[in-house]
Curated annotation (Swiss-Prot):
The gene is pepA. The keyword Nucleus does not apply. Its EC number is 3.4.11.1, 3.4.11.10. The keyword Manganese applies. Transmembrane segments: none annotated. It is found in: Cytoplasm. This is Probable cytosol aminopeptidase. Binds 2 manganese ions per subunit. It is an enzyme of class 3 (hydrolase).
Length: 496
């Protein structure tokens, strides 16, 4: 679907549907007043009958109003002035899109520029609107024998004032790239694990490198992983017929003298728990355990599409965690790339085992900041639910930048503590560190484990176990998060 930005009066455009706002108390927005005057008070007459109160979520479709080039006018309730938050605004936009899809028209014009969203300027409001529209077009029916019919809606025009047109266009460009990145992430996450395995993800990286010539891609196989001394990473994949892969993608859009930013993604393409086997109920959703790697793919795609003037390295630690005669066992001790030894007390705490070696590997790029992204702990879902990603790290400035980016992108994170006292839970009598820290503070102790491998890095950890996918029901599937947060962080660094 194409998004177009124009600065014209709404009545001048020929369109299948013109969308205008009505506030609570039947207050007409600026565009609605123009349409009302041209149509001889047609909207006012409808509102006087009580057909629409202007509350959030209400809408009313009018046909063939006089003196208009639009075939239909869709009145949309937007609530009280200056009380509209991000979530209600997104719901309004999603409702508009669903209505437009059902009408069958090929285009629509949205005259909603006068809507006030709390703490949002013209750019921020348009970002939310455009991202919701493009992301709302997402479908995943690759494996359905009967595909959904192609949608008639091909173009939506966003109207704004002349003075804001450049800023609104910038917001649309950013939102479109982010939504495209989210779609890439969602597609990878929704694929079945018999197709989306570590080798497949390596192929996707190479395909991305072919599409974007300024991307350098290297895929390291199991022999290279072993030769690098990544004993922890290698141990996770050794029980599977699908060999592990370390995927390294480098984009150099900034100056050669500038240190890169690094994104490190957990890519467990299916997690049975290994010998520490998970319960069978809901295990199908463990295909989403590569959500961290998928979100790095999506963020990188957005960066490439926007050609951001930054240097970025993306490292994906991809493996399949399976039980077998060759799988690692509880009690095994492995040596990491850093030289530290780890006692594997639970093979289902495997994400940290692949990430620790990937984080050590990232040091060779001398990054100015490293962010790892992982569906790491069920404890994070208990603590924060499905709305907020967990955030921990060793650099206060980096943490604040990520919190700010999450707020700006409406893709929030929340900081959890990383106090030294928690480190004691990882003590092992036989190795330098144990891979689990007991039942308490599971999200924190998982990050404590990773912190042992990031002492030379400005590092942050995003636990997206609750936000990477939606469980069960008709809305089941990958969400595309935290692509908006990560892309916003990089936009801020690029000052784009």
């Amino acid at each position: 679907m194409e998004l177009v930005v124009k600065s014209v009066s709404p009545e001048t455009l020929k369109t299948a549907t013109l969308v205008v706002a009505v506030g609570e108390g039947r207050k007409l927005g600026a565009a609605a007043r123009q349409v009302d005057e041209l149509s001889g008070g047609a909207i006012s007459a409808v509102l006087k009958r009580g057909d629409l109160a202007g509350k959030v979520g209400q809408s009313l479709l009018l046909h063939s109003l006089p003196n208009l080039k639009a075939e239909r006018v869709l009145l949309v309730g937007v609530g009280k002035d200056e009380e509209l938050g991000d979530r209600p605004f997104r719901k309004i936009v999603a409702g508009i899109l669903n209505t437009l899809k059902g009408l069958g028209g090929s285009d629509a014009v949205l005259a909603l520029d006068e809507i006030i969203v709390k703490n949002r300027d013209s750019y921020g409001k348009t970002r939310l609107l455009a991202e919701t529209l493009v992301d709302g077009e997402y479908t995943f029916d690759q494996f359905k024998s009967q595909k959904a019919e192609p949608r008639a809606l091909k173009k939506i025009t966003l109207l704004t004032i002349k003075a804001a047109q450049a800023e609104v266009q910038r917001a649309v460009n950013h939102a479109t790239a982010i939504a495209n990145g989210m779609a890439f992430t969602r597609n990878l996450g929704n694929l079945p694990p018999n197709i989306c395995h570590p080798t497949f993800l390596g192929e996707q990286a190479k395909n991305l490198g072919k599409e974007f010539k300024d991307l350098k891609v290297e895929v390291l196989d199991e022999k290279k992983i072993k030769s690098l001394g990544m004993g922890s990473f290698y141990a996770v994949g050794q029980g599977s017929a699908q060999p592990p892969r370390l995927i390294v993608m480098q984009y150099n859009g900034g100056k050669k003298s500038e240190k890169p930013y690094a994104l490190v993604g957990k890519g467990i393409t299916f997690d049975t728990g290994g010998i520490s086997l998970k319960p069978g109920a809901g295990m199908d959703e463990m295909k989403y355990d590569m959500g961290g790697a998928a979100s790095v793919f999506g963020t990188l795609r957005a960066v490439l599409e926007l050609k951001l003037p930054i240097n970025l390295v993306c490292i994906l630690a991809c493996a399949e965690n399976m039980p077998s005669g060759t799988a690692s066992r509880p009690g095994d001790i492995v040596t990491t790339m850093s030289g530290q030894t780890v006692e594997i007390l639970n093979t289902d705490a495997e994400g940290r085992l692949v990430l620790c070696d990937a984080l050590t590997y990232s040091e060779r790029f001398k990054p100015q900041a490293v962010i790892d992204i992982a569906t790491l702990t069920g404890a994070c879902v208990v603590a924060l639910g499905a709305h907020t990603s967990g955030l921990l790290g060793n650099n206060d400035e980096l943490i604040e930048q990520l919190l700010s980016a999450g707020k700006a992108a409406d893709d929030r994170a929340w900081q959890l503590p990383l106090f030294d006292e928690y480190q004691e839970q990882l003590d092992s009598p036989f190795a330098d560190i144990a891979n689990i820290g007991g039942p308490k503070a599971g999200t924190i102790t998982a990050a404590c484990f990773l912190s042992r491998f990031t002492k030379n890095l400005n590092w942050a950890h995003l636990d997206i176990a609750g936000t990477a996918w939606t469980s069960g029901g008709k809305d089941k599937g990958a969400t595309g998060r935290p692509v908006p947060l990560l892309t916003q962080y990089l936009l801020d660094r690029a000052k784009a």
